[in-house]
Amino acid sequence: MRLYELVLIVRPELSSTEIDKLTDELTSIISNYEGKLVKHEYWGMRSLAYKINRNQRAHYIMLAISANNNILQKLKNKIKNNLEIIRSRFIKVKEISQTTSPILKNQSFEQTAIDVTS
């Protein structure tokens, strides 16, 4: 099995329960075909570099998985048919870091800075 990071950009109108349901559907595909979810991160609501389908902001989700080609095809089909997902990207990696991603580290720093000035 190869290692991949899957980054999803999801419509901003979705609630946290709908986002959880979406990620559960994807992780069930992974586990049903003997893949493994190694890491899951919710990067929060972020501004897009440019408008995508009239959206200026969206939810970002990252799934680090161990999967074969069959699982990738199943995930790609599911993502393609899901209207809630604006964009997705599979990235093949050599190893998956167990530490918090830099995006989350920067986000928590910004939130702390905002809380201090309030």
Curated annotation (Swiss-Prot):
Disulfide bridge map: none
Single GO MF descriptor: structural constituent of ribosome
Single GO cellular component term: cytosolic small ribosomal subunit
Gene3D superfamilies: 3.30.70.60
Biological process, per Gene Ontology: translation
CDD domains: bS6
Pfam family name, one: Ribosomal_S6
Source domain of life: Bacteria
Keywords: Ribonucleoprotein, Ribosomal protein, RNA-binding, rRNA-binding
PANTHER family cross-referenced by the UniProt entry: MITOCHONDRIAL 28S RIBOSOMAL PROTEIN S6 (PTHR21011), SMALL RIBOSOMAL SUBUNIT PROTEIN BS6M (PTHR21011:SF1)
Function: Binds together with bS18 to 16S ribosomal RNA.
Family: Belongs to the bacterial ribosomal protein bS6 family.
Annotated protein name in UniProt: Small ribosomal subunit protein bS6
